[in-house]
Amino acid sequence: KKLSQQLVKAYDELNITKTLNIQPVAGFIKGETAAGTGLSTKTADYVRDIQKVNTSQLVKLFDKSQPDGNINIFGKSIAQVLGDGGSNRKGTTKVFASEALNEKDIYTYAQSLAGSIPLVEVRNAKGVVYYAKYDGKIINLRNYSTSAQESKARWTIDIIGNKDINKVSNLSDNKFEIKFR
């Protein structure tokens, strides 16, 4: 019942402000799936719609024919960083000047890419990784990067196995990254 109320509230907020805020919903997804219960059909459909919108936007980032390299996260337009410390020339890594986003925003965005599959936390010697595997794809969110000094990245999302990105980027790489400063 609480999840339904949060969904209605998020939908109402979207209609009024034209800004989608799924942060409360992400918390319920994690809670419901941890409790061993599945999501209701309505909730699963809602989450799948958010996933489609955000994944479509993500795929466009790697499309070399798209002139706009910005990304919209929770109503905030985040500019891509080009040049030194920015996105790489090959096109597999995009860096964003995302200082306006907090850790929860970035985590929730990564969760939206994974849909109803909750991100699982793993700690290692380098830091923390949250990951989700679905439909032959993997979404990793990590708080470390080997290029952190150059890119100034706080968080990196790895997108592994997304054939749509391969198609639009004309690259055969299996792993693409978006980095958040």
Place the predicted regions along the sequence by residue.
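Low-complexity, glycine/serine/proline-rich disordered segments
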Residues: 1-117, 121-122, 160-164, 172-181
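Functional cores of ribonucleases/endoribonucleases
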Residues: 117-180
